[in-house]
Amino acid sequence: MGGGGDGELSPAEARLAMMELANMISVPMALTAVIRLGVPAKLWAGGANAPLAAADLLPAGHPDPSVLERLLRLLASRGVFSEHTGSSSPSPRRFSLTAVGRTLVPGGGGSPSGSGASYADYVLQHHQDALVRAWPLLHEAVLDPSGPEPFARANAGVPAYAYYGKDREANEVMLRAMTGVSEPFMEALLEGYGDGGFEGVSTLVDVGGSSGACLEMIMRRVRTIRDGVNFDLPDVVAAAPPIPGVRHVGGDMFKSIPSGDAIFMKWVLTTWTNEECTAILSNCHKALPGGGKVIACEPVVPDTTDGSTRTRALLENDIFVMATYRTQGRERSEEEFRHLGLAAGFASFRAIYLDPFYAVLEYTK
């Protein structure tokens, strides 16, 4: 890079970098737009992924395909699409899905099993109107960290979880989004942790298990687990479907947690303060026998900050939690998670990295 005041960028390069940052909102909004237009599915076409021009992706007779082409070019620059240009001129630009883009279509990379899950709903859920309204109020989280999170401030005081409880359509998108994100990780968990990690477990409790889908996946793979307990708020488990071998139990994890040989939880600790996390883990400790363990799957931020995709994804998600769910909820480093477990009475801790985003955190009594 050219020389500059910071020894890395020239003044012109620094200004260019800031121009990119200032306009970065165009990237997720363009991504949301092409998903709503059905572009990834049209390109994928059951696995064909043949390069197509913008005009081919729109209804016949569309007055100006160049508008879509501009979105596709932007997303090609971000690695979502590959751009193909012919040797002759004029030749229309054509686009196909990259490995990143294929995560937006069922069976294209979002879920190794090809179950039908994808990351498309995750993108759509993050850019619903109610969530987008929160971002201009992000500075309020700094000025008043103990007050309502930006989402609630922007939506007449209604927190995100209450909003999803009232808006059926938004809730369905959110549930599909969580499925799309969860399935690939759960497959990685079962492949890399699987039978050995759940050895000796006959009764498994899933804290915050929602519909019980993750518990069902585990029990389908680990046949030694005979009794599954899907534990969540009463109104959540009331809507959960029947699952063979699974009992749906309603309650409050801050009061008590059902007993089991092991306790599983995924993305539960992120939205709580250190004190609240310690309370949750303390109740887990009480519910376990000697040698029992908590298997918590959480994003773990690195100790040092760099520009890698992994670090950016983790830190961006941390701010999403701040803006949407809980200002004082936060993602943590491995050492911070270790201290939470020790404070709750656990004898040992280890972190297992099976996925670039989630880590498996093992707390043993």
UniProtKB/Swiss-Prot annotation:
Involved in nicotinate detoxification in planta. Catalyzes the conversion of nicotinate to N-methylnicotinate, which is a detoxified form of endogenous nicotinate in planta. The gene is NANMT1. SUPFAM superfamilies: S-adenosyl-L-methionine-dependent methyltransferases (SSF53335), Winged helix' DNA-binding domain (SSF46785). The lineage of its organism: Eukaryota, Viridiplantae, Streptophyta, Embryophyta, Tracheophyta. It comes from Oryza sativa subsp. japonica. Its EC number is 2.1.1.7. Keywords: Methyltransferase, S-adenosyl-L-methionine, Transferase. It is an enzyme of class 2 (transferase). The keyword Methyltransferase applies. GO terms for molecular function: nicotinate N-methyltransferase activity; O-methyltransferase activity; protein dimerization activity; S-adenosylmethionine-dependent methyltransferase activity. The keyword Transferase applies. It comes from the Eukaryota. InterPro entries: COMT-like, O_MeTrfase_dom, Plant_O-MeTrfase_dimerisation, SAM-dependent_MTases_sf, WH-like_DNA-bd_sf, WH_DNA-bd_sf. S-adenosyl-L-methionine binds at D232. GO terms for biological process: biosynthetic process; methylation; nicotinate metabolic process. This is Nicotinate N-methyltransferase 1. Belongs to the class I-like SAM-binding methyltransferase superfamily. Cation-independent O-methyltransferase family. It catalyses: nicotinate + S-adenosyl-L-methionine = N-methylnicotinate + S-adenosyl-L-homocysteine.
